[in-house]
């Protein structure tokens, strides 16, 4: 079979205007970037304000493994197959970060015959949204540092006289807004700024990856440009010496930050290999952010299509949970059904019976099975790993929506093991189970899956949130740990307890929680496979994201700036003699 890159480069593409018109967009509602990409103007929402909305399908997965489960492959394949059976369908997915592209994970355009094309354009830069987020974010960091410098240099009276601005009295050790870059770079996790004469005061700072920026979450959760402007104004950049918040609005930088992102709020339209439309917008990670594409992209697609297929990052304990408790809480758009992706390899890797260590995963040691073992039939490991799939089935079902299991078939899979797995799933709480060959067959490979999803979406949704707004922060943490992960409880550090009290006193206790934890286990510990029990979730820090509208709980050793592994992806990427990019995948 051809590589993903070869398949993409040989694809026969339609002009993106044709894709948009077929979806229901007007030519003037598309801002063209060549023939393959277009920004969608938000004026389409006004034109279609009274339009009946389609059905939203959320794709999630079992606990991820280094072998890849094929969640985006399934999302794109399902969209292609829904269109093939006569349903009007559109995919809505996130923009890939270059950190994982050059790191371990690689691109995020799907794969095989179920991918967004041209895949190299999607995986590198796209229409520049992530760069806009980085620039706007770093403007905020530069602004707070400059304000601190001038206030310290002049003092209150002289500063107000010369600048005409209010003295903010910034506490240097309480600056909360640091800098971002769209790369994995561990040496930037802890830095000092303001060093040298006329550059200070000095204070400790850091870099996060851009996908972890609150601006990325705001981009994903805003309803329109005006809403984004209000949210950016609420950003808490620092505290003053009295412990009061200093916002981007207080600093006077919110308008300029919004201006930088004025085009970034428009989703980008691309196409799949069979010409199905795909809206790509925002890129928050699911382990250190809320892990879902934008409300705006969903809203546009739902007014134009019968079915909209979106996905949450990593397993159902991560992106799906945040889709429900953060995104749906703010959008009001509940899903009609969920698709839960699994593979035989994933279940064996999640069996807890593997012993080999993956040395290429940065910061953590993750048990894995080598390729030779994982491709061989092994009923004992499969049955042990099924417990993980069954947990995820029940986890999705507790939100009141029907769940369809999609088994992403690999060429090496055993027919007997596939049959056993289908029978096991059909005896579970899942609505149905289908084998997907979308990777190898494109639209023809997920017809049965599409038909089952349509039937599942006909059931009246009983969607429910995991916890109410009015619950205390401690109660929300306990619910997420005990119900969301099956933990015995939650443990807050002294700092986290103080932060919970402070955030509640400041009026932020009603916000939902965004748990930043490892995606490689249902628990906080990546070495605990299958369905861990009797563990306590350690919360070390609570971070306010007032603009996005949630509070992040940092769990265990999770980092907001990844590092490159021993064998980074950039080693395979180059330009060939024809000037074409090679090695992406």
UniProtKB/Swiss-Prot annotation:
Q: In which pathway does it act?
A: One-carbon metabolism; tetrahydrofolate interconversion
What UniProt keywords are attached to this protein's entry? ATP-binding, Ligase, Nucleotide-binding, One-carbon metabolism
Catalyzes what? Answer: (6S)-5,6,7,8-tetrahydrofolate + formate + ATP = (6R)-10-formyltetrahydrofolate + ADP + phosphate
Short name of any one Pfam family annotated for the protein: FTHFS
Tell me its EC number(s), please: 6.3.4.3
Q: Name one GO biological process term.
A: tetrahydrofolate interconversion
Which residues are ATP-binding?
65-72
One annotated GO molecular function is: formate-tetrahydrofolate ligase activity
Locate the coiled-coil region(s) and give their ranges.
Answer: none
Family to which the UniProt record says this protein belongs: Belongs to the formate--tetrahydrofolate ligase family.
The record's annotation in HAMAP family points to: FTHFS
Instruction: Kindly give the NCBIfam families that the UniProt entry links to this protein.
Output: PRK13505.1, PRK13506.1
Annotated protein name in UniProt: Formate--tetrahydrofolate ligase
Name the source organism.
Shewanella baltica (strain OS195)
């Amino acid at each position: 079979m051809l590589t993903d890159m070869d398949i993409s480069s040989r694809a026969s593409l339609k002009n993106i205007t044709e894709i948009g018109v077929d979806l229901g967009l007007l030519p003037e509602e598309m801002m063209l970037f060549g023939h393959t990409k277009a920004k969608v103007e938000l004026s389409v929402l006004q034109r279609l304000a009274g339009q009946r909305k389609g059905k939203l399908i959320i794709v999630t997965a079992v606990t991820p493994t280094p072998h890849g489960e094929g969640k985006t492959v399934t999302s794109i394949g399902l969209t292609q197959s829904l269109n093939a059976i006569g349903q009007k369908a559109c995919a809505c997915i996130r923009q890939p970060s270059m950190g994982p592209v050059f790191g371990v994970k690689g691109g995020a355009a799907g794969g095989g015959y179920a991918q967004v094309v041209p895949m190299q354009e999607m995986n590198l830069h796209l229409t520049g949204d992530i760069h806009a987020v980085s620039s706007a974010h770093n403007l905020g960091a530069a602004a707070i540092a400059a304000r601190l410098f001038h206030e310290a240099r002049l003092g209150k009276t002289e500063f107000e006289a010369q600048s005409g601005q209010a003295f903010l009295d910034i506490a240097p050790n309480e600056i909360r807004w640091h800098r971002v870059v769209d790369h994995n770079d561990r040496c930037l996790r802890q830095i000092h700024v303001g060093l040298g004469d006329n550059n200070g005061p000095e204070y400790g700072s850091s870099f996060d990856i851009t996908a972890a920026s609150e601006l990325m979450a705001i981009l994903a959760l805003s309803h329109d440009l005006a809403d984004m402007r209000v949210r950016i104004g609420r950003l808490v950049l620092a505290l003053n010496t009295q412990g009061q918040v200093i916002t981007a609005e207080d600093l006077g930088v919110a308008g300029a930050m919004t201006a930088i992102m004025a085009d970034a709020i428009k989703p980008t339209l691309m196409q799949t290999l069979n010409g199905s439309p795909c809206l790509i917008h925002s890129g928050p990670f699911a382990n250190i952010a809320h892990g879902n594409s934008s409300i705006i992209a969903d809203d546009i697609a739902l007014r134009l299509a019968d079915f909209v297929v979106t996905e949450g990052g990593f397993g159902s304990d991560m992106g799906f949970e945040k889709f429900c408790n953060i995104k749906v809480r703010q959008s009001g758009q509940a899903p009609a059904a969920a698709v839960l992706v699994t593979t035989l390899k994933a279940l064996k890797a999640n069996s807890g019976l593997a012993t080999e260590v993956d040395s290429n995963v940065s910061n953590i040691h993750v048990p894995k099975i080598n390729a030779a073992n994982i491709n061989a039939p092994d009923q004992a490991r499969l049955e042990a790993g099924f417990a993980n799939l069954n947990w995820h089935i029940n986890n999705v079902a507790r939100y009141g929506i029907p769940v369809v299991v999609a088994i992403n078939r690999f060429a090496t899979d055993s027919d007997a093991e596939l049959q056993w797995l289908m029978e096991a799933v059909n005896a579970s709480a899942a609505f149905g189970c289908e084998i997907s060959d979308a990777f190898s067959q494109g639209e023809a490979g997920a017809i049965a899956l599409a038909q089952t999803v349509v039937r599942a979406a006909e059931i009246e949704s009983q969607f429910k949130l995991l916890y109410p707004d009015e619950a205390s922060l401690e109660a929300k943490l306990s619910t997420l740990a005990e119900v969301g992960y099956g933990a015995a409880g939650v443990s807050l550090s002294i700092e986290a307890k103080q932060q919970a009290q402070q955030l509640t006193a400041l009026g932020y206790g009603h916000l939902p929680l965004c748990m930043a934890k490892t995606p490689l286990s249902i628990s906080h510990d990546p070495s605990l496979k299958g369905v861990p029990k009797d563990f306590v979730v350690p919360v070390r820090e609570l971070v306010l994201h007032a603009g996005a509208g949630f509070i992040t709980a940092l769990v265990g050793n999770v980092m907001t700036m990844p590092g490159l592994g021993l064998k980074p992806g950039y080693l395979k990427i180059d330009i060939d003699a024809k000037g074409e990019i090679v090695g992406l995948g």
